[in-house]
Amino acid sequence: MIKAITLIKRKSGITVQEFQEYWRHEHVKAIARLPGIRRYVQNHPLPENYVIGMPVCDGVAELWGEDTRTFKDMASSEAYQRVQADEEQFIDRKSTQLILTSETVLNAGSPQPGGIKFLEFLQRRGGLAVEDFQHYWLAMHGPLVSKLALLRRYVQSPARPGGYSADYSPAFDALSSMWFDTREDLRQTMESGPYAAIIADRINFLRNEDISNLICEEQVIIG
């Protein structure tokens, strides 16, 4: 199974509310017609993401397909052409960032209705090979995160090896997804001793300790 993660920004002149409403209620009609979709999820940043400036993006889409052939067929379909045409209504397509990933579930709890999803966009430390980054994140760092007391669910989504070449790397190397029941649970977690240890461990495999993140409302559209 492959998961395509897309970071999208709203078109100039469109408010956050207008963007989210169109994406949530109108754009999904075009997405639903794509061939081969196994699952489709929208992540809508909550208002607090905009308090101190512009977040890394205005939305994160996650779309699952069986294999690379599925995505190739999807990209060549008439339905995908309609998706692209509809994106012009509300998305700044020049700023769109796409990464193909494989996901690993480290904490398989079920998200609660009304809960929040905390996304972190990870970039590996300079000089660290992709395979070494992914191994450390999964085998060493992941267990620290998965044991957090108030964590409901935890998923790692590293970029697939085929997304790298001698002269190209994706915009980010991985997406970390953590679910909590409430904002207060997230706040308490970030102020805890175990989370301080997680922050301290980042120097071993991440480029920056201060990484881009979003606090989101997750909306499962398909699957």
Q: Which positions does each model-derived feature cover?
A:
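Macromolecular interaction modules
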Residues: 1-223
